[in-house]
Amino acid sequence: NSTLGITDKPTVGYTDLSLEANKVSCLGRTVGLDMQTGLPSSIDSWGHELLSSPVRFIIRTDAGDKKLNGTLVPSGQSGGKISATWKAEDADLLLTCQGTMEFDGWINYVYSLSPKKDLQIKDIRLEIPMLTDAAPYFMGLGLPGQETPVNYAGGWETQGKTVHDYAVSIPTSKSTSWLWPFDSFWCGSEKAGIHCELRGATYTGPLLNLYRPAYPDSWYNNGKG
């Protein structure tokens, strides 16, 4: 049983993470953080900026979008991992987040949303506004590798390509199986890009054709996305 890769020490070829003001840097990449939301305000990959404006986690109620700003509090730092926590609340709800960036550029956000009273939520979404020139190609969420569509109303299931089985979208044929799963996407160019994957409290995605967990209630939304 190998113990390689268990520690936070970067593997050979990578450099230690560095933190300067609100910027975290790893090999070839720098992520600027919005100190009020904890989300990236800029992502530079080998000299190529990817974002046109800061990433936003939006909660929409009948009264409109929530304006929740907190304070980013560092919680741990090593050569291979930097972590922070964030919290914001109002009279209706409490939103907390734990964020981690690792030496290979992987960033993980774990959100917890707790209502303080009965509340009608119309939408919860993550917006990643990318520069047009930085995002000519798209792949994932049920789409093959292609030019980035102007509009795409996707869900967790695709009519004619998947069948619903035990809360999981299963491809109907081998020719469409490589489009599955629909929980992640990549958008970018031959120079740089962003890969985004949705996870859950007990959901970490499929494992080839052997392990196909049900999508989590937190974002599955009965297949509607």
Where are these regions (language model features)?
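Beta-strand/loop-rich accessory regions of lumenal/periplasmic or secreted enzymes
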Residues: S2-G225
